[in-house]
Regions:
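Loop/turn elements at helix/coil->beta-strand transitions in domains of secreted/extracellular proteins
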Residues: 44-50, 75-79, 99-104, 118-122, ...
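Active-site-adjacent "gating/activation" loops or surface patches in catalytic cores
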Residues: 247-255, 261, 266-269, 326-354
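Helix-loop-helix "hinge/cap" segment bordering the ligand-binding cleft or interdomain interface
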Residues: 152, 157-230, 251-297, 302, ...
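Conserved small-residue motifs centered on glycine
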Residues: 384-515, 524
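Ligand-binding "clamshell"
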Residues: 114-127, 152, 316-344
């Protein structure tokens, strides 16, 4: 059966590649695809058409997308974008590498190192002198941290770049999330610990077993699908008050890596999940659910809480907001820890992820044109189009140059159908996705403009925020401290492969956790299941002897680089 599934996935991946070949940058040899777009005044303009594949799920923009065509009119180019469907990133990228044929742009996600090792990307630094928006996107020191072992830059990390200062209003990262209806029912209590969080959900479900339409409420979901099983396994380091280094805890005093998987807090956390599963609070379908089913279930408004990254469930939030009858079913983050008195660090400042990014492939027929396309996407006028839309349609500008939106504009920005037809942020291309617009007056988008952001909220969220004395999602959590020199360590672990000893251990850790942690959560005898898991974990994963020393070496390297050594 597994072989059949892998074969089916490979066929789907091949179909995806063939589909892009027919419509994007790798069509006829030595010919760059072009098409005609209509301008706002009805004129026809011929533009270049590039192709891109992003090895993550996403929403495809509609043909004739208004903002995409507006951008194309101004810069003379557009990009047809395909997203991951029906297979893993490794499977999709593996098919491309095997066929040695690629779209013009690729973000390979977890298949990035394979792409670089296969020689699939061109060296961006061989071209960037003629494209200042790209070359100046990062500092020399930041570019040096992105360089491959041969000294070249093959990818551009797209996310987390700040213009001037961070002004974010949305906690886009990981948290324990809870619906505003649950908090309102309990008169907006202060929730500080894991026990308090689940106690509130238990009491709410007991008092409110069903939705108004009669469907059962669900207390808690846990996404375990593929690489997204972080929703199950990494909460212990947050509960101990550490930021999201992803692969380990880093002791702030000794700068030594600690394995969060085996701490006392980890055992207490999984024991709590086990208890909640037995009580019926945790959805019994949760450990076998695929990502699409998880998003669908959240979109119904039935799920009271979960751990997740906000960007990972944003599509569900959009669906809830667009429904019109589920305003009290949207989520806010709560900064809980394992015990009272532990200082939480759920929110962090933007950080550079050197393990991933977008690259131009060797199949691209017009490398200079592709560089120019990315360069133009970073022009101030185009950034505003990407992030805000069209003035007078998606936002207004007052006499002081401040951007505002009407209720209709705000509703449109939360309607996925409208977004697909009218807006085009080119989200997986380089962007200043934090901080200010280049005009120095406005946020880079509506989620970074505090006054506009608050006005865009529905009354249920405003009531919740007012009750807690805040105006943004970020203010629901502790203020983020300055990032440490080693942060984030997940940018190191994301790049590990089975070609190294530490990469082998890292891969085996994931296998063991995928296999045993769901069993731990549903076991009749938790202690026996936990002991079996730890025994298998320690037998199969040389964490202390191989992985932690590798982490420690990387931590010290980053500290030395930051110190200029």
């Amino acid at each position: 059966m597994k072989r059949l599934k892998r074969a089916a996935a490979a066929l789907m991946a091949m179909a995806m590649v063939v589909g892009m070949a027919s419509c994007g940058g790798f069509g006829k040899k030595d010919e760059q695809k072009t098409e005609t777009v209509k301008t706002a005044d009805g004129k026809e303009v011929e533009v270049k058409v590039f192709s891109a594949f992003f090895a993550v799920p996403g929403n495809k923009v509609d043909d004739g997308n208004v903002v995409q065509n507006k951008i194309a009119e101004k810069i003379g180019a557009k990009c047809e974008m395909e997203w991951l469907t029906g297979q893993t990133a490794e499977e999709a990228i593996g098919v491309m590498i095997a066929g040695d044929e690629y779209p013009d742009f690729v973000d390979a996600s977890s298949g990035m190192k394979s792409m670089v090792d296969a020689g699939a990307f061109i060296a961006i630094d061989d071209y960037w002198d003629d494209y200042p928006n790209i070359k100046n996107f990062y500092t020399d020191a930041e570019w040096n941290s992105i360089r491959a072992e041969d000294g070249h830059v093959y990818i551009i990390p797209q996310f987390g770049k700040t213009w001037e200062k961070d002004t974010t209003c949305v906690h886009n990262d990981e948290a324990f999330w809870i619906q505003t209806r649950v908090l309102k029912w309990a008169n907006y209590p202060k929730i500080e610990t894991l026990d308090e969080y689940f106690d509130l959900i238990e009491r709410y479900i007991e008092a409110n077993p069903k939705m108004p339409d009669g469907t059962p409420n669900i207390g808690y979901e846990i996404l375990c699908d593929d690489w997204r099983y972080f929703c199950l396994e990494n909460a212990p380091f947050f509960l101990d008050g550490y930021p999201n280094d992803g692969c380990c805890i880093v002791d702030r005093e000794t700068h030594q890596a600690i394995d969060y998987n085996t701490t006392d807090t980890a055992k207490r956390y999984f024991k709590k999940l086990n208890e909640e599963y037995k009580k019926g609070i945790v959805d019994p379908e949760t450990f076998t659910m695929k990502y699409d089913a998880y998003i669908s279930k959240l979109s119904t408004g039935r799920v009271c809480g979960m751990v997740d990254q906000h960007w990972d469930f944003n599509d569900a939030e959009l669906a809830i907001k667009a429904n019109g009858k589920l305003d009290d079913c949207t989520y806010v983050p709560v900064g809980i820890t394992i015990d009272k008195g532990v200082e939480e660090h759920w929110h962090t400042n933007p950080a550079l992820d050197v393990s991933n990014g977008i690259g131009i492939t060797k199949s691209c027929k017009d490398i200079e044109g592709a560089m120019q396309f990315m360069n133009d996407l970073l022009d101030p006028e185009i950034l505003t189009l990407r992030n805000w839309g069209i003035e007078g349609v998606n936002y207004n500008k007052d006499e002081n140059g401040i951007f505002t939106r009407t209720d209709e504009m705000r509703n449109n920005a939360n309607d996925q159908t409208y977004i697909n037809k009218n807006l085009c942020p080119y989200a997986y291309f380089p962007n200043y996705s934090n901080g200010m617009d280049h005009d120095g007056k406005n946020g880079c988008d509506a989620n970074h403009q505090a006054t506009e952001f608050y006005e865009s909220l529905n009354d249920e969220i405003k009531e919740c925020f007012d009750a807690y004395g805040v105006k943004t999602y970020v203010e629901m959590l502790n203020e983020a401290p300055e990032n440490e020199a080693w942060y984030p360590m997940w940018s190191y672990s994301n790049a590990l492969t089975t070609e190294t000893d530490e990469g082998m251990v890292w891969t085996e850790m994931a296998t063991v956790k995928h296999e045993y942690l769901p069993q731990v959560c549903i076991a009749e005898d938790f202690d026996a299941a936990w002991d079996k898991y730890l025994s298998e974990y320690k037998k199969r994963c040389d964490v202390d002897g191989t992985l932690l020393p590798a982490f420690n070496k990387e931590i010290q390297r980053r500290i030395d680089v930051a110190a200029g050594k």
